[in-house]
Amino acid sequence: GDSLDLLNNLASNSVDLVMTSPPFALQRKKSYGNEDQDLYVDWLLGFAPEIKRVLKDTGSFVIDLGGAYQKGIPVRSLYNYRVLIRLCDEYGFKLAQEFFWFNPSKLPSPIEWVNKKKIRAKDSVNPVWWLSKTNQPKANISKVKVEYSERMKKLLKNADEFYTPKERPSGHQISDKFAKDNGGALPSNLLEFPNSDSNSQYLRLCKEMNVKVHPARFPQKLPSFFVNFLTEPGDLVVDIFSGSNTTGCAAEELSRNWISFEQEKQYIAASIFKFLPQESLWQADEIYTKLLIDEPSGFKLPQSMLLFEVNNYCC
């Protein structure tokens, strides 16, 4: 359904995280729906007042907003930066930090400038804006530590061979605490998550049942990072452009409450394939059909009972 109408049904100050990836302002129309580039900024900003209203003071708004080229010329559009600036200047959001999602498996695009004329590099990075309602949103970077580098692993085994605690020429003080094992390294704001899934349960069941696959899915590791980073178990996560409901799946696996909005009923119904445990796969066709006719469907998960209900294309 219309995400703006559905947002109106949420209570003020009730949401801990809005995590979403809206249809980008691409020059070519997509089957999943995307606004014309000239109208896009105003269209997307139409959601800003309601997003800010439903967010808690400690809440965050994370938006994956990839870039695009201007029509017919090898010059980048600034639409996503205009969205960011206006969200902050006109609607009072705070830019907590900018992240960049690097997808090493992304295909070269646009074909005209990259493949044919070879005058531009492959576009493999999406800006991801982390915005907040106040200056102090809830966050804990220690919950999303990454694996140490091989060199750091060697240092932890035998610190004396690698460095001596002292002040560096740069003025930085490297103490003996540098060799402490903290269970992982703090992540940077460059997030490398390949988007190369080709054999997931969702894709297999869509193929078996001849159900249309959502064509613009981000990898689950992306929303999982921000759900872990910015919320606690039991918090409420909302995706206003859910597509195949990857954000909802990430939230479910991390024991968060979640609500997802999607304008295409078929996409939101098919997203049930991501949640079905192995012992319920035989029910996939029945559950999918029930959801298409707005009949709630529940099934047992390893740790809980999930009631999956499509209500005006919201689940």
Please give the residue ranges for each predicted region.
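S-adenosyl-L-methionine
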Residues: G1-L7, F273-C314
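Core catalytic lobe of class I
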Residues: G1-A270, L307-C315
